Amino acid sequence: MSKIMVTGGAGFVGSHLVHKLVEMGHDVTVIDNYSNYSENPENENARYFEMDTDELEYQFENETFDYIFHLGEYSRVESSFHDFDKVMAYNYHSFPSVLEFAKRSGAKLIYSGSSTKFADNTPAASPYAYTKAQNTELLKNYAEWYGLDYTIVYFYNVYGDYENDAT
């Protein structure tokens, strides 16, 4: 059994992941600010914290995790043009806190990259795509500098039960 943190665990992809990890017998902690949550009910066997990722070190200063699935970022491409401040806060400014927490915790970081960063062969297709591309590059460099173990996963056309119409 692994001790796993899922940021964005109340979102569409995250909530399905949480249910599967709990079903597999893992000890799961969910972090979410509930800005874009799924209708998928919370799993009673996981711990939920309503907070932003820049608060990880304060909330969990005495805990370590084996894995951190970082899904907790702003994830809407088109509306990112209208929510620039949110995109920068959720994706760009909070990400170093996730990296530092993963390093201190000794966790492997599984980062949800974005296929939109490949659009037109430029990361500047939208504010969302820009931040995802920047975070991907920062993660690669940070891992090289500090020895952080990581994997980047990419989701394409995700849909299914409990999908929120706003996403």
In which residue ranges do the predicted regions lie?
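N-terminal Rossmann-like NAD(P)+-binding domain of SDR-like oxidoreductases, especially those catalyzing
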Residues: 1-158
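Short beta-loop-alpha junction of Rossmann-like oxidoreductase domains
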Residues: 121, 161-167
